[in-house]
Every structure is written in C-alpha cells, then in structure tokens.
Design a protein with these regions (language model features):
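Flexible "arm" and connector segments at domain edges
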Residues: 2-96, 100-137
Length: 137
C-alpha cells in the first residue's frame, strides 16, 4: 500500500516537472519569436542548420514551403465548405502563417532577402496595370 502512495507522489512530481519544463520551453520560444519576422526566420534557419545536412537543407525547405502552401489551401477549402469536412478560420490563419514563416526561413536558407525581393516584385505588379478594366458603373 505504501509503495503505491510513493509511486503516485513520484508520478505527480514528474508531471509537475514536465509541466514546468513545457512552460519554460513556451516562454523561451515566445522570446525567440519576438521581433521582426526576418530576424525570427534567421534564428529558425540557424537552428535548422544545426540539425540538418547543409547539402540537403535547401531542397528540404523548398519542399516544406510547397507542403505548407498545400496545407493552407486545404484549410481554406475546409473553411469555405469545399471539402468533405469543415474547418475553422483559425486553421486558415495558422496555415497561412506557416506559409509566410516557411517562406522567410526558405529565403534565408537560400540566401534571398525576401523583403527586398517582395518590394521589387510589388513594384512590378503595380507598374503592369490591372488586366481587366473596372466594371461600368
């Protein structure tokens, strides 16, 4: 009987330590995620470089970006009622955030200044004009 009380106490202590560690991990993650997205992406890319082969990391990131875009599309389809199961707007937001974060990390891994590339592309978009004339009033 005594053994079971000791076991229960040990399990509770282990659970408390795990919860405390998870809270500390979330706090550390929140600290790392603060600040401008390009700097956050640089930190994420640095972590990826620590854990993955530098020769395969670029292709892994390109494939991850394509995967995230697909997940965003699927989340939107579910929310819009175009899929067998339904989804929430929060899912759409979260998946789009994954696309943006993964795009920034991929750009960093590939040595692309995504902010500069996006500004240059926006300039092109605004100078090409709209393809369709506005509807008549």
């Amino acid at each position: 009987m005594m053994h079971s009380h000791v076991t229960i106490l040990a399990d509770r202590q282990m659970t408390a330590r795990r919860i405390t560690q998870q809270a500390a991990d979330r706090t550390a993650a929140a600290r790392l995620a603060r600040g401008p997205l390009p700097q956050t992406a640089a930190r994420l890319a640095a972590r990826l470089r620590e854990h993955f082969d530098p020769h395969t990391l670029p292709v892994q990131q390109v494939l991850a970006l394509a995967e995230e875009a697909g997940e965003f599309t699927a989340a939107y389809r579910r929310w819009a009622g175009l899929a067998r199961r339904s989804g929430t707007w929060h899912d759409v937001e979260a998946e789009l955030a994954d696309v943006v974060i993964t795009a920034y990390v991929t750009a960093h891994v590939l040595g692309i200044d995504l902010d500069a590339a996006a500004r240059a592309k926006a300039e092109v978009v605004f100078t090409r004009g709209w393809r369709e004339p506005p509807p008549a009033a």
